[in-house]
Amino acid sequence: MLARHHDPIVAIATAPGRGAVGIVRVSGKDIAPVIAAICGRALAPRQATYLPFRDAQGQVIDQGLAIHFPAPHSYTGEDVLELQAHGGPVVLQLLLARCLEAGAALNPAIGQPWLAQLRVAQPGEFTERAFLNDKIDLAQAEAIADLIDASTETAARSAARSMSGEFSLAVNTLLEQLIHLRMLVEATLDFPEEDIDFLQKADAQGQLSRLQATLTGVMQRATQGAILREGIKVVIAGQPNAGKSSLLNALAGAELAIVTPIAGTTRDKVSELIQIEGVPLHVVDTAGLREALDEVEKIGVERAWAEIESADAVLFLHDLSRRDAALPAQDTINYIAADDRIARTLANKLPENTAIIDVWNKSDLTSPAGLQQVQGGVLISAKTGAGLQTLRQRLLQVVGWQAAPEGVFMARERHVRALHHVQDQLATAGRQLQAARPALDLLAEDLRQAQRQLSEITGEFTPDDLLGEIFSRFCIGK
């Protein structure tokens, strides 16, 4: 994609389907012939002009608004034409074809097409050109896609902050501090004969400590932003008839899963996207965990464990009424033993960073003696809603959600990984500075690697294959 960014491009910029308004966007160098062919005349810069859009025979395709954004004052940094027409698919396809036709028309002065290379844009190519022409950096470009894909209001507002440059400003502030510190180290390396200890005199250790403190704040906001973007996968697990489907319905506020008194009703997963304080959670209800009674249930249990093993958090649901002292002793013993087996399997199968929350359900059906058995976890009734707010807050706590007071900006996992690498490099640099005889060449290399990681976030230094992957995930027309 990068090799062809000089070609003029065109695409439908609005979502597929019918709508009140649809937009066709053209970007490139010297697109005046396309403007003249479709609009019949030149357009005043950055002014919306209502006029007919015509085909090659002069027939009206539609009437709408045309806006010309001359370079460099446009979204892509190139000459841009936007045709805002009625949002019917046929109309927009006719306008798209007309743009391509106008570009291929012969220029009588030279006997060749006006815009021989005018073509349909690749996914994300308009935004890619904005990045290549320094209209936005890479973090802002990613934020545009994240804003489009946002599943909650909080996520959308965070993406808007990143799109406006808040995240980039934070990264560039880190870069400025880091570069200044690196210059001190490089100066000490370049002028070893000078009778001046650059590092001590310039308080290099203090500068590094302040840089690390700033980095910690940025990492906190970026980590929260990654949670908003990626969402959290929460799996409800437990024995049959523990109330897993009822809990999913209660959290979602809708009857999504079938609820019956018959154990083993849920045979396959049921999932729903919900939000808690703007944090998107992908909640999955699974088949009850027990020795399967038939082949279908066996498959359901296997799928349940597959979902559990890929979860960020597991709600281990216990039927507290089954532990009630009023039940026959052997039934209670058997139920507790089965819960204990599941608990051991969860501990063995899941990574240490997977949160497991014990959820004690059916408090409304449990005697006071049974309620006294609860130790730890969250006590709820999926039927009455008791304890659900406590469970929601506990979920946010265990997944690490803690909104920064100055607001969260949207970030991606690659950004968080890069910041962690920077943190590690600065920690190594700190140990070098504290040594009796610092290895300045190693210290300089640590700082150089940290600078490179930060530069990858904004795209100042980014491999072409990563750029291709990022922009290919955009929709065509953006």
From Swiss-Prot:
Which sites bind GTP?
241-246, 260-266, 285-288
Alphabetized, the UniProt keywords read: Cytoplasm, GTP-binding, Hydrolase, Magnesium, Metal-binding, Nucleotide-binding, Potassium, tRNA processing
Q: What is its main location?
A: cytoplasm
Give the EC class as a word: hydrolase
* Cofactor descriptive note: Binds 1 potassium ion per subunit.
Keyword Nucleotide-binding assigned: yes
Q: Where does K(+) bind?
A: N241, T260, I262, T265
Query: What are the TrmE-type G domain coordinates in residue numbering?
Result: 231-400
Where would you find this protein in the cell? Answer: Cytoplasm
What cofactors does the UniProt entry give for this protein? K(+)
Give any single GO term for biological process. Answer: tRNA wobble uridine modification
Question: Where does this protein hold (6S)-5-formyl-5,6,7,8-tetrahydrofolate?
Answer: R25, E82, K135, K478
**Which residues of the sequence carry a binding annotation for Mg(2+)?**
S245, T266
* Superkingdom as given in the UniProt entry: Bacteria
Molecular function (GO) terms listed?
GTP binding; GTPase activity; metal ion binding
**So what EC number does this one have?**
3.6.-.-
A cellular component term, taken from the record's GO annotations: cytosol
Check the record and name the PROSITE patterns matching this protein.
Answer: G_TRME (PS51709)
| Entry annotated with the keyword GTP-binding | yes
Please state which protein family the record places this protein in. Belongs to the TRAFAC class TrmE-Era-EngA-EngB-Septin-like GTPase superfamily. TrmE GTPase family.
What PANTHER family does the database record attribute to this sequence? TRNA MODIFICATION GTPASE GTPBP3, TRNA MODIFICATION GTPASE GTPBP3, MITOCHONDRIAL
The subunit field of the Swiss-Prot or TrEMBL record says: Homodimer. Heterotetramer of two MnmE and two MnmG subunits.
Please explain the role this protein plays, according to its UniProt record. Exhibits a very high intrinsic GTPase hydrolysis rate. Involved in the addition of a carboxymethylaminomethyl (cmnm) group at the wobble position (U34) of certain tRNAs, forming tRNA-cmnm(5)s(2)U34.
| Stated name of the protein | tRNA modification GTPase MnmE
**Gene behind this chain?**
mnmE
